[in-house]
Amino acid sequence: MFYLISYDISVDQRRLKIAKLLEGYGQRVLESVFECDLELPAYRQLRQKLNRLIKDEEGDRLRIYRLCASCREQIEIIGDGPPPETSQDIYII
């Protein structure tokens, strides 16, 4: 199943942890938006990890939209800006 995940996290350290976690499950398409194509077991695993990181009392918000194949085919992209920077480490040898 295809999932669109967006978040609004005010604490930098926690926001970076969530972004890094989501990078392991999908592709960043906007600064705080990821697309993830996951089987149910992987989705459940991701949800458990996200539940442990999200802090309701600190105003964290995360939304997960499940998109069917038909809906996915109707995604529109407007603009061709550069992809968001990733926090991946780069090693020069």
From Swiss-Prot:
GO biological processes: defense response to virus; maintenance of CRISPR repeat elements
Record's protein name: CRISPR-associated endoribonuclease Cas2 1
Keywords: Antiviral defense, Endonuclease, Hydrolase, Magnesium, Metal-binding, Nuclease
Domain of life (superkingdom): Bacteria
InterPro entries found in the cross-reference section: CRISPR_associated_Cas2, Virulence_VapD/CRISPR_Cas2
Species the sequence originates in: Chloroflexus aurantiacus (strain ATCC 29366 / DSM 635 / J-10-fl)
Gene behind the chain: cas2-1
A Pfam family matched in the record: CRISPR_Cas2
Subunit structure: Homodimer, forms a heterotetramer with a Cas1 homodimer.
Residues engaged in binding Mg(2+): 8
Task performed by this protein: CRISPR (clustered regularly interspaced short palindromic repeat), is an adaptive immune system that provides protection against mobile genetic elements (viruses, transposable elements and conjugative plasmids). CRISPR clusters contain sequences complementary to antecedent mobile elements and target invading nucleic acids. CRISPR clusters are transcribed and processed into CRISPR RNA (crRNA). Functions as a ssRNA-specific endoribonuclease. Involved in the integration of spacer DNA into the CRISPR cassette.
Similarity comment: family membership: Belongs to the CRISPR-associated endoribonuclease Cas2 protein family.
Entry's Gene Ontology molecular function annotations: metal ion binding; RNA endonuclease activity
Cofactor entry: Mg(2+)
